[in-house]
Amino acid sequence: MHLTCTKPFDWQKLLKFFAGRATPGVESVAANAYRRSLRVDGRHCIVEVRPDPAGDGLLVSCTAGEGDSVTAVQEFARTVFDLDAPIAEIQSVLASDATLRALLKTHSGVRVPGAWDGFELTIRAILGQQI
């Protein structure tokens, strides 16, 4: 499936973020792709996310099959990779500050990485503070 997003989109920064926090046996980052196991609607599936070569979004594959499970994976991926961020608005606000404006030149399209569920996000936050 193809998920669109507004440009710019800094896939490499997101991938680096997830690579540094990948849970062994659950997630991996390799060959410009993010992969993970996931439970959707009570079924186990493998999700792979990679950039669309056309540059206008992400390609997501999933072993969940069809229907509601695929829709759930699409929604999760949109959240995890922050695909619906209002980039123009964000950049406009950041550009109003001289220091942040300078950073936009080298960090344009940065997104806020999410998590596949609230429990996972909580555990990552707690462990991140401990390390």
Predicted regions and their residues:
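HhH-family (HhH-GPD) DNA N-glycosylase catalytic core used in base-excision repair
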Residues: 1-131
